[in-house]
Amino acid sequence: MKQDIYIRIKAFDCSLLEKCIREFIDQLKQFNADLSGPIALPRKDSKFTVNRSPHVDKKSREQFEMRISKRLIIVHNPTSTMMKMLADLSFSAGVEVDLKVKEVNI
């Protein structure tokens, strides 16, 4: 049985996301990891509309937008040292990392 690690990285700021991905891939390439990605996943856009005034002027509104960019990196056949490095890795504020280990039947 082989294992794959699916690493999903999310951030509000696209430039911060790309910087973290570069650092992440550089760390993995030190271990000669077999990688797929980064794969761009669909961006999630959320819009919020609020009233400017608390009492009157219903027509006066303000809109805010939040964009969440996502990338996926797949590590094939990770070693135990790679797993330890992934567990100890820290990212800057505003970047969310989700790790999933999947068994692959061949």
From Swiss-Prot:
Oligomeric and partner information: Part of the 30S ribosomal subunit.
Family as reported in the entry's similarity comment: Belongs to the universal ribosomal protein uS10 family.
One GO biological process term: translation
Function: Involved in the binding of tRNA to the ribosomes.
Disulfide bond annotation, renumbered to this chain: none
Listed InterPro entries: Ribosomal_uS10 (IPR001848), Ribosomal_uS10_dom (IPR027486), Ribosomal_uS10_dom_sf (IPR036838)
Protein name from the UniProt record: Small ribosomal subunit protein uS10
Pfam families the record matches: Ribosomal_S10
Keywords linked to the UniProt accession: Ribonucleoprotein, Ribosomal protein
Gene3D superfamilies: Ribosomal protein S10 domain
Cellular compartments per GO CC: ribonucleoprotein complex; ribosome
Coiled-coil regions listed: none
Gene behind this protein: rpsJ
Organism: Wolbachia pipientis subsp. Culex pipiens (strain wPip)
GO molecular function: structural constituent of ribosome; tRNA binding
